[in-house]
Amino acid sequence: MCRTLIDGPVRSAIAKVRQIDTTSSTPAAARRVTSPPARETRAAVLLLVLSVGARLAWTYLAPNGANFVDLHVYVSGAASLDHPGTLYGYVYADQTPDFPLPFTYPPFAAVVFYPLHLVPFGLIALLWQVVTMAALYGAVRISQRLMGGTAETGHFAAMLWTAIAIWIEPLRSTFDYGQINVLLMLAALWAVYTPRWWLSGLLVGVASGVKLTPAITAVYLVGVRRLHAAAFSVVVFLATVGVSLLVVGDEARYYFTDLLGDAGRVGPIATSFNQSWRGAISRILGHDAGFGPLVLAAIASTAVLAILAWRALDRSDRLGKLLVVELFGLLLSPISWTHHWVWLVPLMIWLIDGPARERPGARILGWGWLVLTIVGVPWLLSFAQPSIWQIGRPWYLAWAGLVYVVATLATLGWIAASERYVRIRPRRMAN
């Protein structure tokens, strides 16, 4: 009897311990999620290594594999701080005779990049590519975490996505030019992922100080009521302006009073590489549309569509809501070069592997974007334009240049409509 009295509680305790056993040979995460076999994981590692190696081989062995023109502008433009008053007079024309590239970034970017001019450029270029690839993998991993993944799972898919994404057009041009947009995307994703308001604000504010386009992320912070983070991002951005005024006062004032908003200085508005509303409508009209009635109407219509898409998404879908904001920002900006469209990587992940993947049309959109970007339609269209400066072109080329714009509208429209489908369909089934 005594044994029975003891055995009962003991057995009950053992049963409970087994339920919460963390030393089991099968971790809880593994029991919840089926991990890929070791062979598949090794294959993903091999594919990633081959992809990285092929990209580096292309850079250094192929004719015109990469010219790093934007990285030259970052580094050499920042070096002009040694000669006061020359920052926004600097141009890089060694490999761009058709368009000598000026330093077009906020003055804080020059402060950030200034130390790099002390390092041999060849070493900077190599490290820049490696850091960009690491940032791409980091962006994929954070995208997975925003969709509910854990630190222990998702590495297999992340390696596959990174290996493939290296070769889509936004990333190809990023590597070719030595662009910074992947790092800025990583900062924005991290700002959304972290619960620390001050870190979110710091990341968005600093990123906006280096390049203005990440400022659109503050709209997301306001939309999800992270008001402290949004306000702090403004404070940090203003602090970057203050630092710029202290270091290069006259140049900073010149940028924010004269150069800010001068899209023509950034580059040719109507080249096929500019996949914004302003670029698309300018190609159709045959002249720079500016922010005229047609462009403003297109932006306003897109804003309405983006709001509908935002409202259709579940509150917990942080990545989906962020993507709605970033896609709207790409169409809003006067210039959205193809290397600005690195946001298509988390978009494809969200469509193919995310919470909406089972909805009709999700994977069609995801794979459709992948085909568009692997082919690189704007890049192909660039061969049909006589020069990057010529705005007028045959009507069929002008309309073909809407490719990213139309695909974005289709994506936003699908997000808004698919939620309606989910809400209505169960009622129809019940009838």
UniProtKB/Swiss-Prot annotation:
It is an enzyme of class 2 (transferase). InterPro entries: GT87. The keyword Cell membrane applies. It is found in: Cell membrane. GO terms for molecular function: GDP-Man:Man3GlcNAc2-PP-Dol alpha-1,2-mannosyltransferase activity; phosphatidylinositol alpha-mannosyltransferase activity. Disulfide bonds: none annotated. One of its GO terms (cellular component) is plasma membrane. GO terms for biological process: glycolipid biosynthetic process; phosphatidylinositol metabolic process; phospholipid biosynthetic process. It comes from the Bacteria. Its EC number is 2.4.1.-. Pathway: Phospholipid metabolism; phosphatidylinositol metabolism. The chain crosses the membrane at residues 43-63, 108-128, 148-168, 175-195, 202-222, 229-249, 290-310, 332-352, 364-384, 397-417. It is a multi-pass membrane protein. Keywords: Cell membrane, Lipid biosynthesis, Lipid metabolism, Membrane, Phospholipid biosynthesis, Phospholipid metabolism, Transferase, Transmembrane, Transmembrane helix. Belongs to the glycosyltransferase 87 family. NCBIfam families: PRK13375.1. Catalyzes the alpha-1,2 addition of a mannose residue from polyprenol-phosphate-mannose (PPM) to a monoacyl phosphatidylinositol tetramannoside (AcPIM4) to generate a monoacyl phosphatidylinositol pentamannoside (AcPIM5). This is Polyprenol-phosphate-mannose-dependent alpha-(1-2)-phosphatidylinositol pentamannoside mannosyltransferase.
